[in-house]
Amino acid sequence: MPSAFGFRFDNTYRRLPEALFSDCLPQPVSTPAFVLFNDNLAQELGLDSEALSEHPEFFSGNELLAGSEPIAQAYAGHQFGSLTMLGDGRAVLLGEQLDGHGQRHDIQLKGAGRTPFSRGGDGRAALGPMLREYIVSEALHALNIATTRSLAVTRTGDRVRRDTLLPGAILTRVAASHIRVGTFQYAAGQQDPVLLEKLVDYTIARHYPALEGAENKALALFEAVMDRQIDLVVDWMRVGFIHGVLNTDNVTLSGESIDFGPCAFMDRFDPNTVFSSIDHQGRYAYGNQPSITQWNLGRFAETLLRMMDDNTDIAIEKATTSLKSFSLRYEEKWRAMMNKKLGLFGSETEDDTLIADLLTWMHAQNADYTNTFRDLIQDGLPDGEQYQSEAFQHWHQRWRARLARNSKPLASSLCLMRNHNPAVIPRNHLVEQALQAASEDNDMTPTHALLQALSAPYADRDSDDRYRQPAAPCEQVHQTFCGT
């Protein structure tokens, strides 16, 4: 039976072996108060949003919801290539909400205090990073990209010490699950085959039920996860999203984007773009995201070798053969995505050159990634000085000739482009301005306005004009920070 607020918890993860989690209560805060509450998401979850919006105590750890059984999850992670034992150092999973369609959603408090995995951390979070996660996750959702969601951001009334004292906050994160590649690395590290098999069976039942009964369930799971990760990174590349800290603990088995600490969106097109202040070597640069995803999947495959085959050599061969297919699978899906961005139906031998030549021109001209593709939807040559060059005009003629050979009319091509090229993204300078106003001036107006613009990213709305403009030189964001 649902509670008075519509919560229907059915907490299956904590029925797994205790090695995978620790019981852990969220730690109370001084004076909880909502700064953001996601009414639409609450309703999707089957919750009474109107009633809940009056009760920040449930989203701060001050009171527990009926049916919640809080835990902190254990996991490991390759962080910039080095394996580390991690776990939820500042997050508490309250439980799993069943919505009206029987779909299961993790409800997690991020910034809820110290846990058994906190090590030297305080377990808390600052307002700015929690607002960033809310903004970016909801923007990705509106862009039709698989992602965790944000139900609320709650001020704690306490201060957290980072470089300076900052207002504290807790994010209520909603996810299909929080099972990560790092979860499997942790389980494999326990040297307990039964534990690993139970985790595999649980993940298949929760996320890939069609695989139940597969002849080689470990290999089948690996390939299914690889397909979802390819779809995810192709979508990131489509909108110029740079995750920034693509460690194995930030790769979900559900295929959702997760953890948005130093993430950013690319303005000027450059495959080498890096924003994260801790990514000194460009490991997680925009153009490296496909290859690092393949690397992360390799670490996932390593955890499953014993289940793929009793013979280690045969298991390695199976995993390697599957992993080698990543590049071809990715290229096919990336090419299909780029064709949609350019309104191309069918396939011609020149298409690859047409795509490559445009990207080369964009890189050389420091062209805005988002606006260039959106400008192509205009009738005739796009407005703007950069489009008057002979090189672009020659490319534009070739492209229009290719559109004329499409199997569908021009109107269909333009519709396809509008649906795959956003007009509005969370531009880094606008996100930073919103976070600064909220953290320093207690002013949420810029955040609300930005969220409104991001709610319909493919629409042409005059009210969104300022959100489409690239940053002025004095507004440019050159680095982002994880905020932990």
Curated annotation (Swiss-Prot):
Q: Where is the active site?
A: 249 (proton acceptor)
> EC no.?
2.7.7.-, 2.7.7.108
Among the Pfam families in the record, one is SelO
Q: Which reaction does it catalyse?
A: L-seryl-[protein] + ATP = 3-O-(5'-adenylyl)-L-seryl-[protein] + diphosphate; L-threonyl-[protein] + ATP = 3-O-(5'-adenylyl)-L-threonyl-[protein] + diphosphate; L-tyrosyl-[protein] + ATP = O-(5'-adenylyl)-L-tyrosyl-[protein] + diphosphate; L-histidyl-[protein] + UTP = N(tele)-(5'-uridylyl)-L-histidyl-[protein] + diphosphate
Residues bound to ATP are: 87, 89-90, 110, 122-123, 173, 180, 259
Q: List residues binding Mg(2+).
A: 250, 259
Q: Which cofactor does it need?
A: Mg(2+); Mn(2+)
List, in alphabetical order, the Gene Ontology terms for molecular function in this entry.
Answer: AMPylase activity; ATP binding; magnesium ion binding
Arranged from A to Z, the UniProt key words for this protein are:
ATP-binding, Magnesium, Manganese, Metal-binding, Nucleotide-binding, Nucleotidyltransferase, Transferase
Highest taxon of the source? Bacteria
Belongs to which family?
Answer: Belongs to the SELO family.
Its job: Nucleotidyltransferase involved in the post-translational modification of proteins. It can catalyze the addition of adenosine monophosphate (AMP) or uridine monophosphate (UMP) to a protein, resulting in modifications known as AMPylation and UMPylation.
Protein name, please?
Answer: Protein nucleotidyltransferase YdiU
- The gene from which this protein is expressed is ydiU
